[in-house]
Swiss-Prot record:
This is Cystatin-SN. One of its GO terms (biological process) is detection of chemical stimulus involved in sensory perception of bitter taste. The gene is CST1. Human saliva appears to contain several cysteine proteinase inhibitors that are immunologically related to cystatin S but that differ in their specificity due to amino acid sequence differences. Cystatin SN, with a pI of 7.5, is a much better inhibitor of papain and dipeptidyl peptidase I than is cystatin S, although both inhibit ficin equally well. SMART domains: CY. It is found in: Secreted. The lineage of its organism: Eukaryota, Metazoa, Chordata, Craniata, Vertebrata. GO terms for cellular component: cytoplasm; extracellular space; vesicle.
Length: 141
């Protein structure tokens, strides 16, 4: 009986250690699954910059827009990488013809800010140096 209890306690201790060391459910990366992207990651930053650049090319506004804040960033590894961004963008005081648009200040007057909530989907195949904007949807916020 004592040997049975010892074996049972050893199994329970092993299980407890395994569960403590296993990653949390939200940290697990499932192949093909969508998970939160690290905004400090260089590839994520490149994808976001690409989305904003394509967005600015498509707008008829003379003024450059850039992210006010990123609400959510996710990614999915498939035959490349899908990036999904939910971003609040704002209108800057810089026209699109000016250099170094990333440092442009935002309009301070509310009627000129023209904030928008945008969702972008980017598909990238890094080893082929290929990137495309799959979806782009924006609405006034």
């Amino acid at each position: 009986m004592a040997q049975y209890l010892s074996t049972l306690l050893l199994l329970l201790a092993t299980l407890a250690v395994a569960l403590a060391w296993s990653p949390k459910e939200e940290d697990r990366i499932i192949p093909g699954g969508i998970y939160n992207a690290d905004l400090n990651d260089e590839w994520v930053q490149r994808a976001l910059h690409f989305a904003i650049s394509e967005y600015n090319k498509a707008t008829k506004d003379d003024y450059y827009r850039r992210p006010l804040r990123v609400l959510r960033a996710r990614q999915q590894t498939v035959g490349g990488v899908n990036y999904f961004f939910d971003v609040e963008v704002g209108r800057t005081i810089c026209t699109k013809s000016q250099p170094n648009l990333d440092t442009c200040a935002f309009h301070e007057q509310p009627e000129l800010q023209k904030k928008q909530l945008c969702s972008f989907e980017i598909y990238e195949v890094p080893w082929e140096n290929r990137r495309s904007l799959v979806k782009s949807r924006c609405q006034e916020s």
